[in-house]
Amino acid sequence: MTHLVDLLEKKRKIAANLEDILSVDSKRTALNDHHSRRKPRPCGMTIHTGVGCSYLCAYCYIYDMGFTAVPKPYPLKPEEIVYALTQNPYIVPERTLAAYGSVTEPFLPETVHRAIEYVRDIWRWLNLPTQLSTKAILTDDIISGVLSGDPNASVLITVVTLSNRRLEPRAPDPLKRIESAGRALEKGLKVSLFIRPIIPGVTDREAEKILTASADKGIDSVVLGSLRVTESILWRLEKSGVAREEIEKRLAEPLKGSGQIEVRSSDLKDKIRRLAEEFGFKVFRAACEANIYSHGRYCAMCRIGPCNIDVKAKGLDEEDLRDLLEYLGIRYLGVEVDDKAVKIMLRKTGMDERIKYLVSTATYRKTIIIKA
């Protein structure tokens, strides 16, 4: 077997080991959970460490999704969520990125223990590269907990304003977040500034102060991201002192109830990017790029790649790809491989979308299907 097939065999063996450990009820619970079937997002497979968040940030989308301000730890036990991931057809051990912090703050008092457990067990069993996004203060316990799980974890500290506390009424003071991030860096945690979402008329005007405060604490990398709004998010932003017209004039399309609409901000991103580069920051084009760098990987899966070109692409030849396709039961006519893409020649262009995604994830390259 070549190393690509080894990855999928590893997943099968982990699942078999866990089946011997878990009870019938635990296995049923894991199989019924969405982590067992959900397709990863561009940032990776979002791992839910809890549901709901008490920070009540005005720009947050989770309340439109039905989540409340009363957070609860996610119900799956650590080994149950690992088992769920082994059943997910999109997941590849050692390759799929794990993103923590999508529908809750991972380090709330109610969720921090579960978050650390998940990081430790998912890394121990599957070696999925860890990324956590947070507005919490990084305490010594959190820092040591993350490092003991995945020592190369990428941690994103969210700061979008220093002055408008109405936007994040229950979140920790942003300067204290930055200060704790500096301490975490000194202890070996890989921390980046997370300026997302960029709120027009707010974040762009405070960007220089945010970058200055972060640079003073030793942070030297940043991820930038745009805002998405619903009708209720826009209402909350306006109530928090944000100029409504600044948002409305940038909407990609009209608002539709709870539907999330992009707020165009490429000009603001460019402005902040230039500022950050003047400060000496490494500006990541997406959150996943920060995770790739943190773990010393090379990736050319998507249109923004290749990422981390200072690292040599993992060796891959045509035999590796042929073995993987045969293992997956794919009939092919030919294959081509380079550092940026794998090309698969088929008699017809149709290929199961999950298989195509799996090949890209396993190889960290874009997959191109060619009708021969």
Language-model features: where?
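Intrinsically disordered, low-complexity boundary segments flanking structured domains
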Residues: A30-H35, A84-P89, D270-I272
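Local cysteine-cluster metal-coordination motifs and their immediate loop/turn environment
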Residues: T46-G66, A300-P306
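Short, glycine/acidic-enriched capping/hinge loops at junctions between secondary-structure elements
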Residues: Y59, V70-P71, E110-V112
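Short microdomains enriched in Cys/His and/or Lys/Arg
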Residues: V70-N88, D320-G329
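Conserved AdoMet/S-adenosylmethionine-binding subsite of the radical SAM
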Residues: E79-L268
